[in-house]
């Protein structure tokens, strides 16, 4: 994108008439711009002046009145880490980033179930997997680099399943530029689509797990060694009728049983989800249903297996791990007096021990 001609900002009244597309076409800001009280528009200032102005405003504000927000696209880990350290040095805990809005349900559920708020596998595990299930996720559009791994997994014979409210065209067939054969003829990415209601994820996945448990397809050894609460979950699923699950999911008993049988017979599987799962009032329930299936089948901690909360931007996971979050310190540690004291010993200045 070319640099913006700063003269167009001297009177910003004309900008109000432009569409968002027209505003983007103006280009990127090449210099700091300032609009002073009473002026019709913005004028260019130096970087030194911009930094001095921002510094003075921050210094004049009390810590509880400060707030810092970091976006994720293009932000490296070092930027996240340095920002959270600077904000906490100011005595504030008011730092946030775009990743929290996207995957908070994943963070909460993964931390409370498996102990780590991150994916348990990598793209290379797709290649070694028998089944790859995408739930509310469209990698062809949102993570196109990942499709080359998907292509190789398909070549090995993996079954690819999509659970979504919409049959995404890119998930039907995609042309992968880095693979000559695919670039010419395209690659069929998905073997089977399961369409569900908006908000029907948890019900559909509960039906899948209901079939697995009812037919004895669970991994009993893994469950005994690594999980708890199976019998309570089994009783809850048995008490839920197929009619209820059909009404809530928008799918059919046969389709839920079909996917349950596929996963029940698979030796390995990766469950992948994205915004289509988390951006709901029931986001945590949706993610928990995914974790329950993986736990019941032992699809965690082995090659070709895993839970993958796939991210949309290059720097998103860094925001979660580097502590650019009012409720988490670096490495994802909770904000409390004990963890704050450990960080204080390293940094040499007081760390706010509350996220409020």
Role assignments for model-derived ranges:
Residues 1-19:
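Long, contiguous juxta-domain segments that are non-catalytic but functionally important
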